């Protein structure tokens, strides 16, 4: 029962934040000059860059102070984890009223609204695995990685203790614990995190992607992954989600699986799309 309930878990998102305000001015200048130029005079490469910049203007944060970015990551992670854990607890307390589909929907909707709300501030990672992958491929300054991860973990821990205080005693089902063998659990978490980052990277970096649908696509991917992997591993995809619930309940069963498999899956998913991108 515990393994099944923990299967309705959380996730995260991410769009690479812009590094400097100067870069924003360059983008605006380039887009402005190219928009007034005769399309026939633009090379294919220039048109491609123009399309890319026009798409990015709506989703890449401008130069935002690091304090505001990490604050957005803290509050966003808190909202996400609080929503997911509360939904799981309601399902347990009311005889599976939510069901796996309901919990997956709750997590997917939470991710969707948070991406729409925070993407322009921090990129809305809410997940150390995403931040690590973004840093590895140069989309997040290395100096920002530790502050991002710290704020995400603190947000998840705070949300887990808030849930524990409100619904005490908390059922251990909120903890992500494998309901399959260790090797199987490792690869399940690796694969679903791979899926998540493959989609995020495609939408965030491909000029041909429909950028207005990023929030919906990422939320739908989270929902899909929970439906696929929830009953077997808890479908964490997010080290912060796993750490927060583990600390709040004092249960650390096979926690290393989630701390190792998810970052590796995130890096692999991002790398896979980078390799095939046109």
UniProtKB/Swiss-Prot annotation:
- Which GO MF term does the entry hold, naming one? channel activity
* PROSITE patterns assigned to the protein according to its UniProt record, in alphabetical order: MIP
Q: How does it sit in the membrane?
A: Multi-pass membrane protein
Sequence intervals crossing the membrane: 70-90, 99-119, 141-163, 185-205, 213-233, 255-275
List localization entries.
Answer: Membrane
Q: Which UniProt keywords apply?
A: Membrane, Repeat, Transmembrane, Transmembrane helix, Transport
Record bears the keyword RNA-binding: no
Record's Gene Ontology CC terms?
A: membrane
Q: Where is this motif: NPA 1?
A: 127-129
Tissue specificity of this protein? Expressed in leaves and at lower levels in roots and anthers.
Which Pfam families does this chain map to? MIP (PF00230)
Q: Which family does it belong to?
A: Belongs to the MIP/aquaporin (TC 1.A.8) family. NIP (TC 1.A.8.12) subfamily.
Q: Domain description from the entry? A: Aquaporins contain two tandem repeats each containing three membrane-spanning domains and a pore-forming loop with the signature motif Asn-Pro-Ala (NPA).
Functionally, this protein is described as follows: Aquaporins facilitate the transport of water and small neutral solutes across cell membranes.
PANTHER family per record: AQUAPORIN NIP2-1 (PTHR45724), AQUAPORIN NIP3-2 (PTHR45724:SF55)
- What is this protein identified as? Aquaporin NIP3-3
Q: Which organism is it from?
A: Oryza sativa subsp. japonica
Q: What is the lineage of its organism?
A: Eukaryota, Viridiplantae, Streptophyta, Embryophyta, Tracheophyta
């Amino acid at each position: 029962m515990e393994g099944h309930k923990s299967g309705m878990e959380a996730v995260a998102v991410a769009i690479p934040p812009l590094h400097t305000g100067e870069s924003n001015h360059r983008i605006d200048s380039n887009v402005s000059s190219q928009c007034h130029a005769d399309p026939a005079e633009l090379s294919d490469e220039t048109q491609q860059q123009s399309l890319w910049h026009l798409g990015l203007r709506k989703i890449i944060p401008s130069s935002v102070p690091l304090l505001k970015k990490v604050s957005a990551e803290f509050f966003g992670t808190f909202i996400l984890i609080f929503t997911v854990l509360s939904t799981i607890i309601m399902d347990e307390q009311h005889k599976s009223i939510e069901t796996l589909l309901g919990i997956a929907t709750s997590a997917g909707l939470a991710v969707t609204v948070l991406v729409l709300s925070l993407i322009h501030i921090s990129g809305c990672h809410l997940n150390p695995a995403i931040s690590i992958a973004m840093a590895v491929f140069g989309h997040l300054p290395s100096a920002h990685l530790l502050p991002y991860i710290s704020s995400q973990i603190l947000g998840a821990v705070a949300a887990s203790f808030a849930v524990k205080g409100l619904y005490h005693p908390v059922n251990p089902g909120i903890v992500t614990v494998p309901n399959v063998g260790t090797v199987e659990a490792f690869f399940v978490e690796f694969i679903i995190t791979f899926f998540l980052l493959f989609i995020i990277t495609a939408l965030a970096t491909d000029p041909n992607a429909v950028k207005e649908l990023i929030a919906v696509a990422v939320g739908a991917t989270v929902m899909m992954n929970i439906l696929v992997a929830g009953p077997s591993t808890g479908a964490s995809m997010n080290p912060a989600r796993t750490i927060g619930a583990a600390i709040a309940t004092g249960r650390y069963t096979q926690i290393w699986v989630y701390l190792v498999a998810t970052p590796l899956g995130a890096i692999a998913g991002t790398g896979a799309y980078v390799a095939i991108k046109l």
